[in-house]
Amino acid sequence: MNNKTNWVIIGRFGRPHGIKGFVTVHSFTDPADNILRYNDWHVFLNKQWQPLKLLTIEVRSKAIIAQIEGYPERELVSALTNLDIGVQESQLAALAPGEYYWYQLIGMSVINSKGDLFGKVVEIMPTGSNDVLVVEGEKRHLIPYLPGQFVINIDESQQVITVDWDMNF
């Protein structure tokens, strides 16, 4: 159960909030409050995923804050700061064919239709209008994630994304 490959990071704990053991939650879900859909939170601590029991979680205008069982005070909950929040991959909703969670694209190789290797996807950057693949290789490439326009094919089995993009961009 603690095999790291079965886990998806959905957020990260921030700093303590107030004096009663609340902690800020930085959600990696889109929209941010989708993190509330997952009940079975775990934290990677002491080289393994450990379950957390949420006592309270609140969405405020500028933050999500949570109170975790076993962390009743500011000093105790500060130990969670900067730790990742994970859920088992099986908790994620099934996607339609051709749709992907961003974590599935991270680490894939990127080539163009000529077979030129750009590098690997290291990050996906939201820009407002469309997301952008950040590809690191001999140089850094920023490629708009627009399936059918710039993203031609995603081969999950080979872990390769084919793009219509020039190496000189």
Curated annotation (Swiss-Prot):
A GO CC term assigned to this protein in UniProt: cytoplasm
Cell compartments where the protein resides: Cytoplasm
SUPFAM superfamilies: PRC-barrel domain, Translation proteins
Domain PRC barrel: 97-169
Keyword entries, A-Z: Chaperone, Cytoplasm, Ribosome biogenesis, rRNA processing
GO terms for MF: ribosome binding
GO terms of biological process kind: ribosomal small subunit biogenesis; rRNA processing
Pfam family, one: RimM
Function: An accessory protein needed during the final step in the assembly of 30S ribosomal subunit, possibly for assembly of the head region. Essential for efficient processing of 16S rRNA. May be needed both before and after RbfA during the maturation of 16S rRNA. It has affinity for free ribosomal 30S subunits but not for 70S ribosomes.
Subunit structure: Binds ribosomal protein uS19.
Alphabetical list of HAMAP family matching this protein: Ribosome_mat_RimM
Entry remark concerning the domains of this protein: The PRC barrel domain binds ribosomal protein uS19.
Family: Belongs to the RimM family.
PANTHER family according to UniProt: RIBOSOME MATURATION FACTOR RIMM (PTHR33692:SF1)
Designated name of the protein: Ribosome maturation factor RimM
Annotated source species: Legionella pneumophila (strain Corby)
Gene: rimM
